[in-house]
Structures are given as C-alpha cells and as structure tokens.
C-alpha cells in the first residue's frame, strides 16, 4: 500500500490573508477560488486582489480569550438557532455542538454540523458559567475566574443558550 506523506510546508497557511484551515470558521458559506488555490490567482493575474471583506472575516471571528478576570469563547454560529446548539461542560472541557437538518437556501439544500471542544482553565468558577447567542449570530460563552482553584467533583452538565435581541457588543481583537 502506498502512503502519501506531505511536507509540512503544504499544510501551512500561505500568509495572513489565507486561512490555514478552510472549514474551521465558515459553516457552509461557500468557497471562493482563492480558498482552494490561493497562490494560483496571483500567478495567473498579477492584478488580481483578494476581497477585503473576506480578509476581515478571517481575522478572528472565532476566538478564545482568557484574562485575569474571565474566560471567554466567541464563536460565529449565525446559521444556527439556539434550539440547534448544545453547550455542555464535561469535567474541564466545554463542548459546543451545532446541527441543523437539511434545508433550502439560495443554492439548493444544505445541512450543517460542527463540534468544538475547549479546555477550561482550572481557576474558572464552573457554577457561574453563562452562554448567550446575539441577534447577529455570535455565541458568547463566559466564565468568571476565581482566586483559588475549586474542585467539587467534576461532572457533565448542560449550559442553556439564551437569545439576545441585540447584536454582539464584544469587539474582536
């Protein structure tokens, strides 16, 4: 059996304007030519410029922030309703799952599903975790940090997702 081994250079992003993994952030929004062959467009046409809008979208829509006072996860899930999202805390991990069945959009029928898993810092107060979905589809998972690490026998528990009527007010960094 032949096994193809790729050099690590082929697995890296080609610069800050190209995402390193295509499907991490955009759940079924469609691909552009430069998403598949980013180096080809500049080779064929030296005057071709990448869309600035797409570059802005690639600049941190999904992110994890951990500072002195809180742990925060921001995730763009605009194609999912709160009923289609599940957020669980299992031991020291946050698991976010989104799934919707096949439905019609502008280009035909589409179904989407994703799983994300994040490790919680040991000093996050797991009894005060919250999760909300803004009107513009930004999921915000937040947990305050405490001074001493609390270990009260970790177990699995679900975190409800609440709907907000206003757009997300958390600026991306």
Curated annotation (Swiss-Prot):
One Pfam family in the UniProt entry: Crystallin
Lineage: Eukaryota, Metazoa, Chordata, Craniata, Vertebrata
Protein's recorded name: Alpha-crystallin A chain
Post-translational modification: Undergoes age-dependent proteolytical cleavage at the C-terminus.
Assembly and oligomerization: Heteromer composed of three CRYAA and one CRYAB subunits. Inter-subunit bridging via zinc ions enhances stability, which is crucial as there is no protein turn over in the lens. Can also form homodimers and homotetramers (dimers of dimers) which serve as the building blocks of homooligomers. Within homooligomers, the zinc-binding motif is created from residues of 3 different molecules. His-100 and Glu-102 from one molecule are ligands of the zinc ion, and His-107 and His-154 residues from additional molecules complete the site with tetrahedral coordination geometry.
Residue span(s) of domain sHSP: 52-162
Deamidated asparagine PTM sites in chain numbering: 101, 123
Residues reported to bind Zn(2+) 1: 100, 102
